[in-house]
Amino acid sequence: MDFFPVLPDHEALDCRLPAHQTVPVVVASPHSGSNYPPAFLEQAAVPLAALRRAEDAFVDELFAAAPSLGMPLLAARFPRSYVDANREPYELDPGMFEGPLPRPLNHRTTRVAAGLGMIPRVAASGEAIYRGRVPSEMIEHRLETCWRPYHQTLSLLVEHTYSSFGGALLIDAHSMPSSASTLGTRDRDQRVDIVLGDNQGEACAPEFTAAAERWFRARGLRVLRNQPYAGGFTTQRYGRPALARHTLQIEINRALYMDEARHERLPTVGVFARLITGLLEEMGRQAQETLQPPRPLAAE
């Protein structure tokens, strides 16, 4: 058993550790949570079905083989419409809240303008989640109970991996609605299956993006890079290639594995999960090769 750092034992998180971490890879799923607090549902102006459309449903299941391959897997249990862990902590719309606000707020981002800050203002349909303004105390409560435990744990996993192997690759796992799968294409009739986000090459070494793209394309899937999703807070915070810390975001078209209208798994979900298992094996090999510490030069 590896001596992993002491990790927060928190009901908001599902952290699955391998018996022995054998590769410098960590997998994270920030948006697959579906534990809706009853008080949140009472506040909501939209039905649960509308809130669930924001979930990256079943993504944690697709990547569930990670621990058996020697990789830690972290998944949020809280839903994205409650707290978005792929946002800055104070990336918020001040107009949502009643009462004193923390300073400074980062309220000028395109994501906040779209209603999709750390505490989202709108559901996936564009409908307002809340009937009116909500107490500003909500901000610190949700940071303390969800956002901070998630990122404290993720940071510990990444740093443990770095200290053990001399480098770390974080795979940030997501899914996208099929309606978004043509947004980055010239031909709107051409569906994209996978979008790889490396923050326009700033979040990971090109070898990682290329390896994932080759893997998916070899299996007949259509792949784009950084369009329409280049990555969010996670790629920006954890992607530091110059410091041997790399992050690659993977967006999967939900139509490949689920019935979006019914919010149910398709019969083919197991087949697709096995494909993802193969991808993780390939990325593990690539990480070992790319992050191999340089050997000292022999003395002359």
Regions found by a protein language model. Give the residues of each.
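N-terminal catalytic or cofactor-binding beta/alpha core of small enzyme domains
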Residues: 1-170, 175-248, 252-300
